[in-house]
Regions:
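Conserved glycine-rich cofactor-binding loop
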Residues: 7, 14-16, 38
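The beta1-alpha1 cofactor-binding region of Rossmann-like NAD(H)/NADP(H)-dependent oxidoreductases
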Residues: 39-40, 62-73, 105
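Substrate-binding pocket helix/loop in short-chain dehydrogenase/reductase
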Residues: 99-100, 107-109
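Conserved NAD(P)H cofactor-binding loop of Rossmann-fold oxidoreductase domains
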Residues: 91-96
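Active-site loop of short-chain dehydrogenase/reductase
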Residues: 6, 55, 84-85, 130-142
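Conserved glycine-rich Rossmann-like NAD(P)H-binding loop of the short-chain dehydrogenase/reductase
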Residues: 28-45
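A short, exposed helix-loop element centered on a Lys and neighboring polar residues
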Residues: 123-124
Length: 142
């Protein structure tokens, strides 16, 4: 798939695999909107990527991925600014190294909210634009 002139949203794009994916997509000519858990983290990643690719279009947002309306609003705003979303990379996730017998319900909910509900919400929000134009790609990492 050619990435030139495609609009991609990458959740968890401020570090690790998400950041590397954003880097590769920008290198190939895509417009990248990355999400991070805080706007500060998103801004830092965007600044680093803009330094490397000064002519590229890259932006950072920090919706609450466990809240559908927060994600919808952020993705709709991104689409109105940069164009309909062509590619969604569901990469955001969290893990806990707590032994299972010490895992609390609160910890379980935190992990499920991002790792499961976050993927659902991002996919649901991105698919609105994709369905309207009749195409799109959704990738999920694990």
């Amino acid at each position: 798939m050619r990435l030139k002139d495609k609009v991609a949203i990458i959740t968890g794009g401020s570090r690790g695999i998400g950041y590397a994916t954003a880097d590769k997509f920008l290198k190939e000519g895509a417009t990248v909107i990355l999400t991070a858990s805080s706007q500060g983290s998103a801004d830092k990643a965007v600044a680093q990527l803009k330094e490397k690719y000064p002519d590229a279009t890259v932006a950072g947002i920090s919706p609450n991925l466990s809240n559908l309306e927060s994600v919808r609003n952020a993705f709709r705003e991104a689409a109105s600014k940069y164009g309909c979303i062509d590619i969604l990379v569901n990469n955001a996730g969290v893990s806990e190294s707590t032994p299972f017998t010490e895992y609390t319900e609160e910890t379980f909910d935190k992990v499920m909210d991002l790792n499961v509900k976050g993927v659902f919400n991002a996919t649901r929000a991105a698919s609105e634009c994709m369905i309207a134009k009749g195409q799109g790609v959704i990738l999920s990492t694990s």
